[in-house]
Design a protein with these regions (language model features):
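A short, acidic/glycine-rich surface segment
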Residues: 36, 65-71, 108, 112
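Core segments of cupin and vicinal oxygen chelate
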Residues: 15-58
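Vicinal oxygen chelate
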Residues: 2-5, 8-18, 48-52, 70-137
Length: 137
């Protein structure tokens, strides 16, 4: 594989100290629609999201679930990670491609929830230590 082609942003995960406050801000101030809010409130899912458009969401990840920043060098402030989408052809060789480019895979392939439902994802760090998720639906 020559290189992968990312086609769109899927989601951004923000570490938030107060999920309810963040939901109010993103829904009432910025006009984004809450998703999985009732499931979060009932304990069925670990975090809610707000939708930017049909293909992009912001996950509001409670900091109580995040590793402490001194232990978790992959995070920079409140950015947990961001996710890019690739096509099936690019994803089929993603682990070999990353390994060939001396990029260590932190996790995956693994099934995770995203802006359009479940998909298969791989996680790794960029040169500055930001966690990147690449996924294929």
């Amino acid at each position: 594989m020559a290189r992968i082609k990312c086609t769109e942003m899927d989601h951004i995960v923000l570490n938030v100290s107060d999920v309810e406050r963040s939901l109010r801000f993103y829904s009432e101030v910025l006009g984004l629609k809450g998703e999985r809010v009732e499931e979060f409130k009932s304990g069925k899912v670990g975090f809610p999201s707000v939708r930017i458009n049909d293909g992009t969401i912001i996950d509001l990840f409670p900091t109580k679930h995040a590793a402490p920043l001194e232990e978790n060098k992959k995070t920079n402030g409140n950015l947990n990670h961001f996710c890019l989408v690739v096509g099936a052809e690019d994803f089929s060789g993603i682990t070999e491609y990353l390994t060939a480019n001396q990029i260590a895979i932190r996790e995956g392939p693994v099934s995770r929830w995203g802006a359009r439902g479940r998909a298969t994802s791989v996680y790794f760090l960029d040169p500055d230590g930001n966690e990147v998720e690449i996924r294929c639906y």
